């Protein structure tokens, strides 16, 4: 997991909550990659003992203060803010990971099931999804990087093992980040904001011989990534692995459907929504992990 705080969003605390969920549902060690400022803030605010209970390793990397990457963050359809989005380290995950097999998970992809346990001992060296869906979608679908560009792969969850394929993929992602303007022109997408999703999509396309047919990279052994968009909200955390969302209706801004998810992983993209319920999540999963430890 990566966590780099900005002026308003405490990614470190979100990562702590998700680490407890990982330990409960996947029962594997968790390593956090962060910067010293974020780590110092997290340990001061939450307590070193609690932080140590969440993570087996914390790897501190230098934060590139010259990296400027601004994006709009929404808290439902009623509030949007422009904030710094420090997401430039994923390409280094291959070298930084202390494991032979790694699940690279965004801190806000909440692990509420054991579904990703199917990844271990896979015959594939790398797995990453291009299929996504929301609670209101009848079936998963695929997007493109831009209207006339290549298939979009989501770097929200990536499985990889030590292998030449994985090493080449992550090395390419680092090169794409360094030369993002060139690749933006080459692949005909308009946004100048750096996205790991875009960088991995380009790298996969290149490794596949600049071809989208018969991709060299397999998808994760799940139906698709379940997305709760930043226009949605959280109604309540009912219990362990049990959440109820306000899911905004398509093309009906501000109109919601209550959606209950149980034993289902979900990418919660409204960071303020998860922050409003973070203490409840920590309380529930901290208690259950302590019980299981004894």
PLM segments and residue spans:
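A glycosyltransferase accessory/donor-loop signature
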Residues: 1-3, 11-17, 32, 40, ...
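Short, acidic, metal-binding catalytic loop of nucleotide-sugar glycosyltransferases
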Residues: 21-28
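A residue-level signal for conserved active-site and pocket-lining positions in enzyme catalytic cores
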Residues: 22, 94, 158, 200
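Short, structured coil segments at secondary-structure junctions
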Residues: 26, 53-54, 98, 122
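Short beta-strand/loop segment that forms part of the nucleotide-sugar
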Residues: 29-37, 60
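Active-site-proximal specificity loops/subdomain of glycosyltransferases
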Residues: 39-97
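GT-A fold catalytic core of metal-dependent nucleotide-sugar glycosyltransferases
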Residues: 86-136
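A short, conserved beta-to-alpha structural element at the edge of catalytic cores
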Residues: 129-149, 287, 291
């Amino acid at each position: 997991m990566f966590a780099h705080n900005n002026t308003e969003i405490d990614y470190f605390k979100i990562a702590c909550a998700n680490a407890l969920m990982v330990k409960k549902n996947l029962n594997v060690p968790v390593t956090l990659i962060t910067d010293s400022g974020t780590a110092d803030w997290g340990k001061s605010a939450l307590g070193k003992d609690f932080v140590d209970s969440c993570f087996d390793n914390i790897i501190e990397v230098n934060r590139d203060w010259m990296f400027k990457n601004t994006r709009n963050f929404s808290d439902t359809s009623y509030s949007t803010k422009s904030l710094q989005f420090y997401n430039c380290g994923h390409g280094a995950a291959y070298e930084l990971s202390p494991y032979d097999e790694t699940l690279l998970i965004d801190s806000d992809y909440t692990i509420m099931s054991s579904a990703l346990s199917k990844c271990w001992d896979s015959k594939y060296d790398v797995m990453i999804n291009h299929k996504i869906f929301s609670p209101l979608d009848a079936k998963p679908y695929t997007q493109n990087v831009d209207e006339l560009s290549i298939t979009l792969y989501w770097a929200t969850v990536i499985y990889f093992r030590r292998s030449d394929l994985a090493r080449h993929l992550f090395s390419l992602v680092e090169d794409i980040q360094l030369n993002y303007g060139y690749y933006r022109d080459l692949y005909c997408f308009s946004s100048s904001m750096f996205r790991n999703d875009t960088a991995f999509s380009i790298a996969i396309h290149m490794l596949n011989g600049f071809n989208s047919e018969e991709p060299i990279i397999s998808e994760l052994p799940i139906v698709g990534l379940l997305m709760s968009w930043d226009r949605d909200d959280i109604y309540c955390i009912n219990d362990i692995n049990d959440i109820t969302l306000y899911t905004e209706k398509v093309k009906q801004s501000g109109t919601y459907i209550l959606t209950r998810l149980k034993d289902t992983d979900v990418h919660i993209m409204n960071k303020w929504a998860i922050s409003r319920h973070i203490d409840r999540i920590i309380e529930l999963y901290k208690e259950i992990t302590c019980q299981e430890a004894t």
